[in-house]
Amino acid sequence: SALAAGCPVVVKAHPGHMATAELTAEAIVRAVVRCGLPGGVFNMIFGTDIGAELVRHPAIQAVGFTGSLAGGKALYQLAQQRPQPIPLFAEMSAINPLIILPQALQTRAEALANELVASFTLGGGQFCTRPGLILALRCAGLERFKSALCATVAGSTPQVLLNAPTLQHYRQGVAALAAHPRIEKLASGIAAGAGQAQTLLWQAQVEDLLAQDTLLQTEVFGPLSLLVEVDDEAQLKAVVKAQQGQLTATLHAEADDGPLAASLLPLLCEKAGRVLFNGYPTGVE
C-alpha cells in the first residue's frame, strides 16, 4: 500500500529468517526494475537495533509494525518523541477470542472441537490470528465439546517453532499459565521432543477474565488455547467488553442463537479489526 501511494519503503528484516527475507527482497527489486520504478524505491536492511534508528530518522514519515505489544509500544514512544511526531501503524499481539453460542455447541460440538484445534495449532500456533481464547456458554452441549476438545488435543503432534527464542518464549508462557493458581491444564498433546512445542489446552475462570487478569490477556505464541466457561448472556457481554483490542473475534452460532449473536456483534466490532462468523481466524489474510 505504501508503494501504491507513491512512497519509497525501507523494510527491517526479521532476524529469524534473514535468508528468506533476502530472497524476497531480490524478487521485489526485480519487479521494481521490470515496472520501471525509480531505483531505491524499495530497500531492506538487517540488524538488531536498527529498527529504532529507522523510526528516529527524519526521512521516515510513517512506520508499519507487526510484533509484540511491548515492541509496538516502544516504537510508538520513539515515533512520538521525534521533533515532528509520525504515525505508527501497528499490528500487535492479540488473543483473538472465539465465542461459541449454545445452539452451535449442541449441534456441532465434535466438529467444532476438531476444527478449533486444527486452527490454534496451524503453523505451530504461530499465526497472529490464532484463537487463543475460547468462550463457551454453559449449556447442554458444553461437556461434549470439552470432551472432544481434550481428545483432539491429546492426539495432536508436537511441532517445531520458528527458532529457539520463539520456543523459549512459548515455554515461558506455558510456565506462567502453570503457575497461576486458578488456571487448570485440561489436556496435553503428544509429548514434545527436544526443540519441539507440545500442544496444550488450559481452562481459566471467568471471574479472572472479568477482572482483566493480565496473564489472561497476554498472547502466548504457540500451539495452545485457553477455555473459559461463561454462565449466561449478560456475563458473556461483560467478558467481551472487558477484552483489550484484538486482531480478530469469531462467533459460532446457529439460527436459534440469532438474537444473542445480533446483540454481540456491535460489541465485537468495537474490539476487533475483523469479526468472523462460523469460521476460524487463522483463515484471515
Task: Give the residues covered by each predicted segment.
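Conserved small-residue-rich beta-alpha loop and adjacent elements
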Residues: 1-35
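General beta-strand structural signal in soluble alpha/beta enzymes
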Residues: 11, 44-46, 65-67, 88-91, ...
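Short gly/pro/ser/thr-enriched loop/turn and capping motifs at secondary-structure boundaries
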Residues: 16-20, 70-73, 95-99, 258, ...
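ALDH superfamily catalytic-core signature
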Residues: 23, 27-34, 62, 70-211, ...
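Conserved C-terminal structural/oligomerization subdomain of aldehyde/semialdehyde dehydrogenase
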Residues: 36-39, 60, 118, 134-136, ...
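A structured beta-alpha segment of the ubiquitous adenosine-cofactor-binding alpha/beta core
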Residues: 42-64
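Short acidic-hydrophobic, aromatic-tinged amphipathic segments that line or gate anion-handling sites
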Residues: 43-47, 100, 226-231
